[in-house]
Swiss-Prot record:
Protein name: UPF0367 protein gsr3177
Record organism: Gloeobacter violaceus (strain ATCC 29082 / PCC 7421)
HAMAP family: UPF0367
Origin: domain of life: Bacteria
Family, as annotated: Belongs to the UPF0367 family.
């Protein structure tokens, strides 16, 4: 499973959708990245392979960062850790 996370202007919480296929995840990442540079701004509609009922719509001008991560095989991330923009931050920073 591949996760595409978005950080929106003025929103400290990342929004995320998942793709089962690496190619589909890469294509979605590229679509969002290209939309960030688009003029005029446009709506980006996203769906999730892991949770099919999940639908997101964001304005391309509000996306300030996008990240594509792959889930590790096996049990995934270590206990208490998750992939993401803030995964590398520790409490004593």
């Amino acid at each position: 499973m591949f996760t595409i996370e978005l950080i929106l202007r003025g929103n400290p919480v990342a929004l995320a959708v998942q793709r089962k296929d690496q190619t589909a995840a890469g294509d979605l990442y590229a679509k969002i990245r290209d939309a960030m540079n688009a003029s005029p701004p446009r709506v980006i509609e996203l769906t999730c392979d892991k949770v099919p009922e999940k639908h997101l719509a964001v304005m391309s001008s509000d996306v300030v960062a996008v990240q594509l991560t792959a889930a590790k095989s096996g049990s995934g991330a270590p206990m208490g850790m998750r992939a993401g923009f803030f995964a590398g931050e520790s409490e004593d920073e």
